[in-house]
Amino acid sequence: LIDLLTDSGTSAMSSNQWAGIMQGDESYAGSPSFFRFEESVRSITGMPLIIPTHQGRAAEKIIFTILGGKGKYFLSNTLFDTTRANIEFSGAEGIDLICDEGKHPSIPAPFKGNMDIVALQQTITKIGAENIPMVIITITNNSGGGQPVSMQNIKAVRNICAEYQIPFFIDACRFAENAYFIKLREEGYSNKTNLEIANEIFSYADGCTMSAKKDAFANIGGFLAMRDLELAIQCRNLLIVTEGFTTYGGLAGRDLEAIAIGLQEIMDEHYLQYRIRSIEYLTNKLIEAGVPVMQPAGGHAVYIDAKEFLPHI
């Protein structure tokens, strides 16, 4: 099956997820399904404060409503479209700082999703750290062709954020593919498990947003995860107004169960190998047919260079 628009919410759920759906607890507050969801997210992110939302853009709406506003700037490798929209809706501005390799679709490089570290430093100096509420790394870089970000780049961004005391968040929609690319392409990680690599990625972040419609295979859902209790309290207060109570966040208990299970299943190396090789297979076939595409193949989709392919439009 090829979906020409998105992989968001279109994945086939596993038999375990469907079984979990049948066990979903629909209690309004304190549902056991929430606590299973919470533990699953914590096991990957290591973050203590977990806030469910009905999908990723709802998590973005909450965090940027609180931290955004006129005169504020959010820096990223490349912001996804809903992320940018929520930033701009708050009155703030989003700035993309993609690395040079990511600007050339047809030239292969192992980590074309990286942030330009020099540009990050220069932009912080120019704008002022006090005007930057957050730096965001999107993994994999969706709007940049599903390209991965290296662990070295994540650490470098983290170090700069720490120097200027700017919160560092991860847009984690496709963290599992990114972890697997690090395992395949980055020195020192070939013998580590995907979970170990994911744990390390999140250890450098102050928080994350995620749409669970991608790497959790779910048809709906998302979450915020963070370490800052004061910020989490503000997010939960807004969640109650816009999404629902803090233990369901606009989701049914059955969806929380499906997400909890999916987050564990995505870490299966055999599945990730199948997924990424499938994308690679289609990418290579298109290259053989003379179709200009983003190279190398990304983790979740084949990106056609439409400007090159259809220059007359």
Functional labels for PLM-detected ranges:
Residues 293-313:
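Conserved PLP-binding catalytic core of the aspartate aminotransferase-like
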